[in-house]
C-alpha cells in the first residue's frame, strides 16, 4: 500500500509538471486565438476539453486540416504546429484537458 501511495504521488507530480510546461506552450503558440475558459477567435480550452479526447486534440494540433470536419467544424483557420515534439504535444494536451468541467 505504501508503494501504491508513492506511485500515485509521483504520477500527480509528473502530471502537474506536464501541465505547467503545457501552459508555457499555450502562452507561446495558442493564446492569440484560444483562451482557457472563454471564447476567443477559436474555441476555449474548456470547450475543447469537454468535447475531445487527447488523440483528437493532438491530431488537430499537428494537422488541423486533416480532421476539422470530423470534429464538427465547417472550416479551420488554425495553422499546423507540426514542429512540436511528442513531449510538447502531450504537455499541451494535458494543459488543455485540465480545463475539463471548469
Task: Locate the predicted segments by residue.
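Sec-dependent N-terminal signal peptides
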Residues: 4-13
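Gly/Gly-Pro-rich "capping" loops immediately C-terminal to redox-active cysteine motifs
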Residues: 23, 35-63
